[in-house]
């Protein structure tokens, strides 16, 4: 039942915010705060209560891949919805779900706080759309029925379209339509793949269902599997986004209001990575294995292209948007490396990118509200005018380039080490992208905040509300940088189940022999990442499943 509340609380708060906002805009804002903070508090409580379960070694609930998936669940609910078509209201939660749900509610709350003074028209309707988006995103991350997943996947497009089109900037309608068309067209390809998988499984087994656990291991030809995998990949590649289907993202970010950019960067594009990890790879492991090299090429292109394009921007917000293209290239690289270190790095990257890039979008939005421009040619020396803003911007710029000691460094380090195990050339080229990240991050600071102030700007520094938001994000990035173990332990069972269920395809194979000698202890793939606590220290990936782990992973052997 608790899983339903994660969807129902923001969904119920949405019309409340709209109605209350018609009388008093302040009530709409506070309703939105409650609608995002309440499920976040509920989730944190569940996370703390489930600490022992998350630390335990993975135990499959049944035979095969489905048993491995179910073994990592913390909670689930499944009731018939459209029974004649085999559609169930099927929600489940594991460590991966906890992480992405926390991002959804946390970034949703930040989006509301960041818009506290910036949104002055149709305030109630605005917060209705934000809460609708949050509820739909929660549904996406909890769904284990592919039809239900697609339902929520499409449902979130509508409120985000209105957020951009109604409250965006000069070219907001163009950006909103482009965002909608890209996502809708690619989503239809995924729908075709889902329906095809439904009929293939039904004809083979007599069980027509959209249930994810039943569809695992569906028998089909390699050509069919590859084509269906491409249908899923198209939808998730657009969301991530992957070059060359990324062009909607800079426009959407540039024209969206601050809240829209925070949700886009912090949560919405993470659906692409989540969908690949949760559905695409487990359903079509051999096809993904065959597609590994082209995908890694696209990932490396995205890393370098996004960084180079960021360097060439005059618009500060568009620069930050292109950094997301580069950072998500690392995510794609880690997904197709598909080993413990890479996958744990991907999950850390999703979190740290959400915090650092979300903070930069809040910073840019606040700056635009003060000086009414995003053109860096009209900036320079702003640190002298607003030193707290300048220092905060420097911190998040350093986080974005992967400064050691911050969470982004740990994430990229794990991804590159994991990638090296399967593809040395991809790891080397991906590491080269970090050099470009340094260039665009420091160039941004030089053009906007350093140098002499020659334009006569005079504006207020960060407010207490802004300082509070940035302080929370800074603390989170520093904490993850020095002690990422809570996140690693939270996701270790999910990573273990994913790696084991795809092992037969060779996707999760290591360069070393994977079969232990007779009488040796079984290897727990998830335990490998337990030695990565600290700022990237320790990368052993051969740890006994019997290793004793202190609360939330403190002290592996």
Regions found by a protein language model. Give the residues of each.
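Transmembrane helix-loop-helix hairpins at membrane boundaries of multipass inner-membrane proteins
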Residues: 1-2, 16-128, 204, 209, ...
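Membrane-interfacial loop-to-helix junctions in multi-pass inner-membrane proteins
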Residues: 22-39, 119-132, 144-150, 168-189, ...
């Amino acid at each position: 039942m608790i899983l339903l509340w994660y969807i129902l609380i923001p969904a119920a708060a949405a019309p409340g915010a709209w109605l209350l906002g018609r009388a008093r805009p302040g009530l709409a804002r506070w309703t939105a705060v409650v609608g995002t903070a309440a499920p976040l508090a509920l989730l944190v409580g569940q996370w703390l209560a489930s600490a022992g379960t998350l630390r335990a070694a993975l135990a499959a609930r049944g035979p095969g891949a489905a048993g491995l998936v179910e073994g990592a669940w913390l909670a689930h609910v499944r009731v018939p919805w459209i029974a004649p078509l085999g559609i169930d209201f099927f929600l489940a939660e594991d460590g991966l779900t906890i992480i992405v749900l926390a991002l959804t509610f946390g970034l949703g709350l930040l989006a509301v706080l960041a818009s506290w003074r910036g949104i002055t028209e149709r305030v109630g309707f605005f917060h209705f759309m934000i809460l609708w988006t949050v509820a739909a995103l929660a549904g996406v991350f909890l769904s284990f029925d592919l039809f239900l997943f697609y339902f929520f996947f499409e449902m979130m497009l509508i409120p985000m379209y209105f957020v951009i089109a109604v409250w965006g900037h000069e070219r907001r309608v163009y950006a909103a339509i482009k965002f909608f068309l890209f996502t809708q067209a690619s989503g239809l390809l995924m729908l075709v793949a889902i329906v095809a998988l439904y009929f293939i499984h039904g004809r083979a087994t007599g069980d027509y269902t959209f249930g994810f656990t039943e569809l695992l291991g569906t028998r089909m030809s390699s050509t069919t599997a590859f084509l269906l995998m491409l249908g899923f990949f198209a939808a998730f590649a657009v969301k991530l986004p992957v070059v060359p289907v990324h062009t909607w993202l800079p426009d959407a970010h540039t024209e969206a209001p601050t809240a829209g950019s925070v949700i886009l960067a912090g949560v919405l594009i993470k659906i692409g990575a989540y969908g690949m990890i949760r559905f695409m790879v487990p359903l079509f492991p051999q096809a993904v294995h065959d597609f590994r090299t082209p995908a890694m090429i696209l990932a490396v292109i995205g890393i370098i292209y996004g960084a180079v394009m960021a360097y060439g921007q005059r618009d500060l917000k568009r620069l930050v948007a292109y950094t997301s293209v580069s950072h998500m290239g690392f995510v794609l690289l880690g997904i197709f490396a598909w080993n413990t270190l890479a996958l744990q790095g991907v999950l850390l990257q999703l979190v740290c990118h959400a915090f650092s890039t979300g903070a930069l979008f809040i910073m840019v939005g606040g700056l635009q509200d003060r000086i009414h421009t995003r053109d860096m040619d009209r900036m320079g020396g702003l640190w002298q005018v607003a030193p707290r803003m300048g220092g905060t911007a420097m911190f998040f710029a350093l986080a974005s380039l992967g400064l050691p000691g911050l969470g982004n460094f740990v994430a990229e380090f794990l991804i590159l080490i994991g990638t090296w195990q399967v593809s040395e050339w991809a790891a080397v080229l991906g590491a080269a992208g970090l050099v470009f990240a340094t260039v665009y991050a420091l160039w941004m600071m030089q053009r906007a905040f350093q140098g002499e102030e020659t334009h006569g700007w005079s504006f207020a520094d960060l407010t207490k509300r802004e300082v509070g938001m940035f302080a929370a994000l800074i603390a989170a990035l520093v904490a993850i940088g020095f002690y990422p173990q809570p996140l690693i332990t939270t996701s270790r069972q999910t990573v273990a189940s994913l790696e084991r269920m795809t092992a037969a395809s060779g996707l999760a194979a290591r360069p070393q022999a994977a079969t232990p000698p007779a009488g040796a202890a079984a290897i727990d793939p998830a335990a490998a990442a337990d030695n990565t606590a600290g700022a990237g220290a320790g990368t052993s990936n051969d740890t006994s499943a019997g290793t004793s782990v202190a609360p939330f992973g403190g002290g592996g052997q």
